[in-house]
Amino acid sequence: MANDENKQKALAAALGQIEKQFGKGSIMRLGENRSMDVETISTGSLSLDIALGAGGLPMGRIVEIYGPESSGKTTLTLQVIASAQREGKTCAFIDAEHALDPVYAKKLGVDIDNLLCSQPDTGEQALEICDALSRSGAVDVIVVDSVAALTPKAEIEGEIGDSHMGLAARMMSQAMRKLAGNLKNSNTLLIFINQIRMKIGVMFGNPETTTGGNALKFYASVRLDIRRTGSVKNGDEVVGSETRVKVVKNKIAAPFKQAEFQILYGEGINTFGELVDLGVKHKMVEKAGAWYSYNGDKIGQGKANATIYLKEHPEVSAELDKKLRELLLNNTGGFSSAVSDYVADYEDNGEEVKNEEF
């Protein structure tokens, strides 16, 4: 018993010395602090928020979003920025690809007048800007588009054709070590968009890999694989794309879930269409024949008209969104039993889907 008391005294003294040297909060018991509650920002897609398990992307963490060209990577990050700005948060966009379209961003709901934007010359400059913004504590969301475009200074100053083996990977590895702690301290969300490359000579398994080495894969709390699976048509006109997002890695909830939603050209994620689908799935929206009803009132004939009704009545869509989140997400940020009915398991049959109605 005396030995236990001596141990507790020694532990208390050690904790006191650590806090005195490194500051209060430098060491703590896991259950005593806000570390139990992860603050999140909505992705703009209700089904993806559900698949992530905590209601969105976690603050203070690194997130990687990767996929083929024209799969919706930049659109998804702009929707995250729009969601954050609606909550009064400050956002920054590091446009290493020099391809950000402010007109399109504005259509997605981004307040471009208050969006910080940088088009860096080198990869080192881009990552230094990220580090400076995160250390300031004044920026809540930083998006880097993309890792593949973060070109090391030595490569830019060299000749085309020169070999620069592993330069980008070393640059990213050093940056991750430096950024991870600063992001946690300032509670800043850092999203990296990444591209896909093919590994040569792979006979078995997936030949796809992402650029920038392995460091980002380890440091990322969430990794999302986004793919276009088909077309959304209005008659013969293609008005959008069916999109599937797989949660390949998740440190805040159960991984290997996936979400499917529509991205409409010029509008972004079809949030109201998701509300109709999820509402019907969980019996909050009644469907009788082609008619959709909510709280006993008819809201439209056909999914397209029901979607338009929710778009024109924001108070109704906000109420339905709140009810669905309360049902599908529990307080601990994990999965409720209802979620498994909607969020599909991690699989990919590779079939293209044609959806005539949106």
From Swiss-Prot:
Predominant location category: cytoplasm
Annotated ATP binding sites: G67, P68, E69, S70, S71, G72, K73, T74
UniProtKB keywords: ATP-binding, Cytoplasm, DNA damage, DNA recombination, DNA repair, DNA-binding, Nucleotide-binding, SOS response
Alphabetical list of Pfam families matching this protein: RecA, RecA_C
A molecular function GO annotation: ATP hydrolysis activity
Gene3D superfamilies reported for this sequence: P-loop containing nucleotide triphosphate hydrolases
GO BP annotations listed: DNA recombination; DNA repair; SOS response
One cellular component term from this protein's GO annotations in UniProt: cytosol
Compartments in which it is found: Cytoplasm
Endoplasmic reticulum recorded as keyword: no
Presence of the UniProt keyword Nucleotide-binding in the record: yes
Functional summary from the UniProt entry: Can catalyze the hydrolysis of ATP in the presence of single-stranded DNA, the ATP-dependent uptake of single-stranded DNA by duplex DNA, and the ATP-dependent hybridization of homologous single-stranded DNAs. It interacts with LexA causing its activation and leading to its autocatalytic cleavage.
Similarity section: Belongs to the RecA family.
Protein name according to UniProt: Protein RecA
Species, as recorded: Xenorhabdus bovienii
GN (gene name): recA
